[in-house]
Amino acid sequence: MAAEKILTPESQLKKSKAQQKTAEQVAAERAARKAANKEKRAIILERNAAYQKEYETAERNIIQAKRDAKAAGSYYVEAQHKLVFVVRIKGINKIPPKPRKVLQLLRLTRINSGTFVKVTKATLELLKLIEPYVAYGYPSYSTIRQLVYKRGFGKINKQRVPLSDNAIIEANLGKYGILSIDDLIHEIITVGPHFKQANNFLWPFKLSNPSGGWGVPRKFKHFIQGGSFGNREEFINKLVKSMN
């Protein structure tokens, strides 16, 4: 007797085809994501190489300009700085309302907190108002990079989130072309077109007390008078290094 042919119900056939289609879609989506991630990594690596070349070229140009000025018997005058890093060095006691509001505006709500500030006529006026309560100056590429890598946190839904993955940065700043931590650093260093968005994404930096203390007999005197507050220009890098 011939074996009976077992017929698969039509509903079961449809289910099997649907499952097969779903599996194929999942595989296709996975392959597409893998290809997109590979392309993205290549873009990030290419950008990083371009950034490094840009930084090195700028540094060489400054060194050469200083040599040329010296050879000509004159002085090298740097271009006007576009960025300062500001550190709050005084607590809440005895700060008048107006400077206190400016500190809040610049997100310097705690002692030893620090933020980047774009240099404009308006921000220079704000810095004058809070000068007795902050130290600030012109951060180097190395200082900015170390700050972001070591102390960098993003503000996501009002939460402080560590920048542990480029995906976090892309999810929040990708619409501005900022895909990685080095894109973020470049936008800050160059005070690029999306500096405001990049800077606002960064949570104010929480720094430590300077290693070895402030090293001055009177902290609340101006830096040029042997104290700690005010504009210390390039010397801000030494301070940040001791607090990072």
Curated annotation (Swiss-Prot):
NCBIfam families: uL30_euk. This is Large ribosomal subunit protein uL30A. One of its GO terms (cellular component) is cytosol. Component of the ribosome, a large ribonucleoprotein complex responsible for the synthesis of proteins in the cell. The small ribosomal subunit (SSU) binds messenger RNAs (mRNAs) and translates the encoded message by selecting cognate aminoacyl-transfer RNA (tRNA) molecules. The large subunit (LSU) contains the ribosomal catalytic site termed the peptidyl transferase center (PTC), which catalyzes the formation of peptide bonds, thereby polymerizing the amino acids delivered by tRNAs into a polypeptide chain. Keywords: Cytoplasm, Ribonucleoprotein, Ribosomal protein. It is found in: Cytoplasm. Its main location: cytoplasm. It comes from Saccharomyces cerevisiae (strain ATCC 204508 / S288c) (Baker's yeast). The gene is RPL7A. Pfam families: Ribosomal_L30, Ribosomal_L30_N. Residues 1-26 are annotated as: Disordered.
